[in-house]
A protein has these predicted regions:
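Core catalytic alpha/beta fold that binds nucleotide/phospho-ligands
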Residues: 1-218
Length: 218
């Protein structure tokens, strides 16, 4: 569905949840699947791991189970690998790169069909972001809020695995450039051993058929 937002050294796959997974689960993954309480979660897990294994195949690495950290719920990648998995109701996606080439990867999918209470902006956005949103027409403001929310999800998913620092929504300030379909973010706090307060970086976003994808890498 989505073209890759990454350079060639990062492998990206996206899948429609209404179709069977391309890559079957490995035994340990299948065992974990049976612990999930709903068919929805099982479908998302199966397709997310399928996308991850397809992405890993580019690097010709021996297949390993990609399980989930019981405490942080992040995927447990092979030692030489950095990656991110996301799903949102209708689609799943994964992005993978080798640790020699990339320090961290973060992706997030959001369905724009889902109605979101705009009041959550007070919990997600810093003052600068709120000012920008409040100057937009209501439909554009809701769209902008979703991009900011998704971008911050991608930022956390990129930085947490390599820093073990919990970032909260207001620890990052996001600026959106609609013309280039990019966003820039500035961190207000340090991520241990990885970034300092004031760190500034950019990512990309794409919207296709009411589905939003945000992506960053370091």
């Amino acid at each position: 569905m989505f073209p890759s937002p990454f350079p060639e050294y990062i492998s990206f796959f996206c899948a429609d949840l209404s179709t069977p997974p391309v890559f079957p689960l490995l035994p340990e993954e299948d065992k974990f699947l049976k612990t999930l309480s709903s068919s929805k979660r099982q479908t998302e897990f199966s397709h997310g791991r399928s996308c991850a294994h397809q992405a890993l195949a580019k690097f010709k690495l021996e297949s390993e189970s990609i399980l989930r950290n019981a405490e942080t719920r992040e995927p447990c990648w092979p030692d030489r690998v950095r990656g991110s998995i996301t799903h949102s109701g209708e689609y799943a996606a994964a992005a993978v790169g080798l640790a020699d080439d990339v320090s961290g990867i973060g992706i997030d999918l959001e369905s724009l069909y889902r109605v979101v209470d705009f009041n959550i902006s007070r919990h997600v956005c810093v003052e600068k972001e709120l000012e920008w949103l409040n100057n937009l027409p209501p439909d554009q403001a809701n769209r902008g809020l979703r991009i900011i929310f998704s971008a911050k999800e991608s930022i956390f998913k990129c930085l947490f695995p390599i820093s073990k620092t919990y970032l909260y929504f207001k620890d990052a300030t996001v600026t959106i450039d609609e013309a280039s379909a990019e966003f820039t973010f500035t961190l207000s706090r340090e991520c241990s051993g990885v970034t300092e307060a004031g760190f500034r970086h950019s990512g990309k976003f794409s919207i296709i058929d009411k589905m939003l994808l945000t992506a960053i890498y370091l």
